[in-house]
Structure formats: structure tokens, C-alpha cells
């Protein structure tokens, strides 16, 4: 009746049962949510909502997110969320669609026009499926790509198409969009729920005054908490290990908090001085992880080139091509 449709293809991480399926309707039937990502602190939010009288059928973070919107509203909910997400929330009562993207934009959110229809998705491939989406290449976006190696938000490789800015909410009234009131620039209606500059200014106003030892202790605590939150899943969890400082620390913290060997994955390059696989192997051996290596040749890399448009949606200067097939093959075996 409102001319709005939500669809979702789920990558199941939490609550693999049908109770976690999306799009999901809130308990009061006012809201319908489809989102890509994960709310890492959903357990804490769930406990707070349960104390306020909310009841849950399953244990997915999607259900918690919906209950939070019912209790606190979307803006306050997003301010409380620790996670990565691109979401679409339909308000059945007010006939308003809200699109939101996480603070630093880990998850993309594309939206634009297919003829006179507003379309959106966390991948450009979703927009391409609309029969009226035939938007050509945006020349300004192409210029940004050649200069920066990627296309920053709000620009998009397609004309009349945009990426939602990180930390923003876009609210669209269904009647206004249907009447063309958005004038093909709905991005002008974006509102920030988080601002990096303001966060930096707050940090500068209250600088850390402890000792070096206290700083190390606090950093260790923050990192361990961050890793623990990301390990919550109803499916096996793995980690990409290069042998460098960052991935080695994350792997060590994962293994310290796991009662089973952590699945680690690394890639190597035959006959190359860039090969870090031996370093990763040493770390994996030291930590007693379940380690998998994938060696890549020049021919392997060339064979991937035809699949790049499907991988990236937009043109993107990135060489991390073989980090995903290895865990996928491991899961299949």
C-alpha cells in the first residue's frame, strides 16, 4: 500500500533459526528492519531492554536492534550501538523510510534512482536487479577514482546514485519520494548521529593523564574486549593472519579466549620477497592455531581479474583478492 518493498539475503552469524530471518517486524508491528552487519554489544543492549520489560523470541541482534528502536528511537539506538551496519528501517505508522550507516562506514549503503523509483542496498548488485536501473557512469566519480584509487562517499560510480555518508541517517517520507519532492538528491536530507571531529574534540578536552604502564594496561583491556565482542557467533570464527603486528595481536587475543584452536588463514606468494607466509606460520605454530595457507601465483591473480566487477561493485584499487576464497573452501571441506 505504501509502495515500499524490503528484501534481504542473509549471512547467518547469530541465531541460525527462522527467528533470525529478515526482514524482521518489531513486536509492536510498527517497524520493519532489514540490515547487513552486526551489533557487537547486542547482549548488553538486550539485558538493558529486558530490564525494561521487553521480551525476545530468539537471540539475534536484529531482534534486539528492533526492540531498541521501539524503546529509544532510532537516533538514540544508533548512538548506543557498537558495531558495523547498513540498515533500512520502515516506519509503518509514519510511512517513513530511514537508511543508516555505521560510524566509520565499514558497511556500504548505496541508494539512487531507477527511473522514478528510489532503490537502495548494501551492494550495488542489488540496485542493478531493478529493471529500470540503467544509470550511466558518473564522470566526477571516475575522476575521484583515478585520483584517489577509490570513490569516497557520497559519490558513486553511477549517475543519480549515491553512497550514504558514514555515521549518517537518511529519512525519506514515502509520499514525498513518490511525488518527486526529493528532486533526485535525497542525500541532502542526511543527518549525522556521530561525528568524527566531535569525537576527537571530546578526547582532546579530556586527555589521558596516566602512566605508560596504565596506558598499556588500558589498551590491552580495550583490545581484549573488542576481540571478545567480535568472537560471539553461532558459526565457526576465523582470522586472517599475515604475521605482522596487528593480525598477530588479534590472533593471540582470540586464542587466549578460545578453548579450541582458532582457525587462521594466510596467503603466500611463490618466489616473492613480499611473501609473509613463513612469518604467519611461525605465529600460528607458536599460538597452536588451526592454520591454512594459500599460495598465489601470477597466473592465479590474472585469472581473478574478470571477476573483479562482481567482487567490488565499484572500481576499487585493492589487491586483497585471495583472502576470501581460502576460508570459504575451508568451510566447505
Protein language model features and the residues they cover:
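Short, intrinsically disordered, charge-balanced linker/junction segments flanking boundaries
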Residues: 314-324
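Single conserved hydrophobic/aromatic residue that forms the stacking wall/gate
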Residues: 322-325, 329-333
Amino acid at each position: 500500500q505504501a509502495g515500499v518493498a524490503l528484501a534481504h539475503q542473509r549471512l547467518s552469524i547469530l541465531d541460525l533459526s527462522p527467528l533470525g530471518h529478515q526482514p524482521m517486524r518489531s513486536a509492536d508491528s510498527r517497524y520493519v528492519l532489514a540490515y547487513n552487519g552486526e551489533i557487537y554489544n547486542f547482549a548488553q543492549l538486550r539485558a538493558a531492554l529486558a530490564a525494561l520489560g521487553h521480551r525476545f523470541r530468539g537471540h539475534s541482534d536484529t531482534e534486539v536492534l528492533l526492540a531498541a528502536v521501539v524503546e529509544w528511537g532510532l537516533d538514540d539506538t544508533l548512538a548506543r550501538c557498537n558495531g558495523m551496519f547498513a540498515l533500512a528501517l520502515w516506519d509503518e505508522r509514519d510511512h517513513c523510510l530511514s537508511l543508516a550507516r555505521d560510524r566509520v562506514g565499514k558497511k556500504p549503503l548505496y541508494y539512487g534512482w531507477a527511473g522514478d523509483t528510489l532503490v537502495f542496498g548494501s551492494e550495488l548488485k542489488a540496485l542493478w536487479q531493478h529493471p529500470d536501473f540503467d544509470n550511466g557512469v558518473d564522470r566526477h566519480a571516475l575522476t575521484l577514482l583515478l585520483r584517489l584509487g577509490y570513490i569516497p562517499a557520497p559519490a558513486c560510480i553511477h549517475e543519480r546514485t549515491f553512497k550514504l555518508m558514514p555515521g549518517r541517517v537518511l529519512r525519506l517520507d514515502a509520499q514525498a519520494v513518490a511525488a518527486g519532492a526529493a528532486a533526485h538528491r535525497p542525500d541532502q536530507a542526511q543527518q549525522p548521529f556521530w561525528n568524527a571531529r566531535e569525537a576527537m574534540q571530546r578526547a582532546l578536552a579530556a586527555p589521558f593523564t596516566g602512566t605508560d604502564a596504565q596506558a598499556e594496561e588500558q589498551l590491552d583491556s580495550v583490545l581484549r574486549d573488542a576481540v571478545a565482542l567480535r568472537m560471539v557467533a553461532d558459526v565457526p570464527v576465523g582470522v586472517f593472519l599475515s604475521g605482522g603486528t596487528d593480525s598477530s595481536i588479534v590472533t593471540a587475543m582470540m586464542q587466549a579466549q578460545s578453548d579450541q584452536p582458532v582457525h587462521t588463514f594466510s596467503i603466500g606468494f611463490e618466489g616473492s620477497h613480499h611473501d609473509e607466509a613463513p612469518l604467519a606460520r611461525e605465529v600460528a605454530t607458536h599460538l597452536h592455531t588451526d592454520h591454512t595457507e594459500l599460495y598465489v601465483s601470477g597466473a592465479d591473480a590474472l585469472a581473478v581479474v574478470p571477476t573483479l566487477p562482481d567482487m567490488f561493485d565499484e572500481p576499487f584499487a585493492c589487491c586483497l583478492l585471495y583472502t576470501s576464497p581460502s576460508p570459504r573452501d575451508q568451510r566447505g571441506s
